[in-house]
Amino acid sequence: VGFKAGVKDYKLTYYTPDYQTKDTDILAAFRVTPQPGVPPEEAGAAVAAESSTGTWTTVWTDGLTSLDRYKGRCYHIEPVAGEENQYICYVAYPLDLFEEGSVTNMFTSIVGNVFGFKALRALRLEDLRIPTAYIKTFQGPPHGIQVERDKLNKYGRPLLGCTIKPKLGLSAKNYGRAVYECLRGGLDFTKDDENVNSQPFMRWRDRFLFCAEGIYKAQAETGEIKGHYLNATAGTCEEMIKRAVFARELGAPIVMHDYLTGGFTANTSLAHYCWDNGLLLHIHRAMHAVIDRQKNHGMHFRVLAKALRMSGGDHIHAGTVVGKLEGEREITLGFVDLLRDDYIEKDRSRGIYFTQDWVSLPGVIPVASGGIHVWHMPALTEIFGDDSVLQFGGGTLGHPWGNAPGAVANRVALEACVQARNEGRNLAREGNEIIREASKWSPELAAACEVWKEIKFEFEAMDTL
């Protein structure tokens, strides 16, 4: 074979519209905005090339391997309705390109270099189809939804949480006191804020000790199992594991990790530790909006959610649909199903580009958190269903009578919504009525209803299809 040096069009090698995808391929849907004058086939092929075997020129070492076996292929391109010069390009990657059990390696290949590519004005990874053969190389969530319910002995309702505020500046003892008050009032969980690690005003070991004390005291008083998400995120993997070990020694039921800032390698290590040692793992998605908020560049959160289910976590923050943080209902429910369910059909109206079979990988509980309060309870119960954690930070600690009454108000509101739903009432239509009725029997709830009656965070959502 003669070796022909020089630059050649990507589309000659990497655009293959006749390709039949294999069950073992990793499939990706990219939203591609080519530079003016670059045809979509060339742009799509360039994405496939740069995220797999290609480089900018022909190299003679290409002859030493079988490119046809290892190359990514752009197999379908469709224009995006309503957008000028924007396309969805579908790319298939052979499974052999990826290391088993490594989300890190998967992302390094698929979204590594290609996003800085000159021929593209913008590029967004909208969805991935992970083949079952690859899923089986991951351990996934340490416990999953059913095991968590069994550990906590809580069934038939969403779980309630609260982020301890002010997020920075409290001493360990005062922090532990807030934990105790919230749990005693009726919450299931309290939470370290994502940026509470180990700062001068509160070192991690002190916080863990006082929080554990608060948990046990609240458990003794209420007869319910309680937990506090002890944030184990640290500057090194070794330090992170050290914190998780200490949490386990205290008998804590759950630890927490910031998986994007901490990184997938650290997260997978922690998930393995939690699996081996019976700890639940709560995942916070700090930094996600840096990656997923722009509509035409970056990566959609549903991809980050799938990656987390592979890497491992029992809870993950997933937006509220109703609070202060962005998230459109159908789209949010799309990736909530991707987190919880075992098998999800392709449904473009919910942003799901591929049918995904998780082959019994445990599910992840979505966490709704951010600017929500008692008036949102019917909507949240309706939207997220039982397998969710509803987190009210300011919505608990902002109660005029204090933390414990704030927790009582949320618990009463939740129980009222669940009961109404079970009786067949329509939460969407009668939500306010249900909360009003319940507040007659609960002065704590009545006070909460009074404080937050008019608050709304009304802006148009950016994330539309």
From Swiss-Prot:
Residues at which substrate binds: N113, T163, K167, R285, H317, S369
Pfam families hit by this protein: RuBisCO_large, RuBisCO_large_N
CC cofactor note: Binds 1 Mg(2+) ion per subunit.
Superkingdom per UniProt: Eukaryota
GO molecular function: magnesium ion binding; monooxygenase activity; ribulose-bisphosphate carboxylase activity
Cofactor(s), names only, from the UniProt record: Mg(2+)
Chain positions recorded as Mg(2+) binding sites: K191, D193, E194
Catalytic activity: 2 (2R)-3-phosphoglycerate + 2 H(+) = D-ribulose 1,5-bisphosphate + CO2 + H2O; D-ribulose 1,5-bisphosphate + O2 = 2-phosphoglycolate + (2R)-3-phosphoglycerate + 2 H(+)
InterPro entries: RuBisCO (IPR033966), RuBisCo_large_chain_AS (IPR020878), RuBisCO_lsu_C (IPR000685), RuBisCO_lsu_C_sf (IPR036376), RuBisCO_lsu_fd_N (IPR017443), RuBisCO_lsu_N_sf (IPR036422), RuBisCO_lsuI (IPR020888)
Family of the protein in this entry: Belongs to the RuBisCO large chain family. Type I subfamily.
Function description: RuBisCO catalyzes two reactions: the carboxylation of D-ribulose 1,5-bisphosphate, the primary event in carbon dioxide fixation, as well as the oxidative fragmentation of the pentose substrate in the photorespiration process. Both reactions occur simultaneously and in competition at the same active site.
Other known facts: The basic functional RuBisCO is composed of a large chain homodimer in a 'head-to-tail' conformation. In form I RuBisCO this homodimer is arranged in a barrel-like tetramer with the small subunits forming a tetrameric 'cap' on each end of the 'barrel'.
Name recorded for this polypeptide: Ribulose bisphosphate carboxylase large chain
Native organism: Combretum indicum
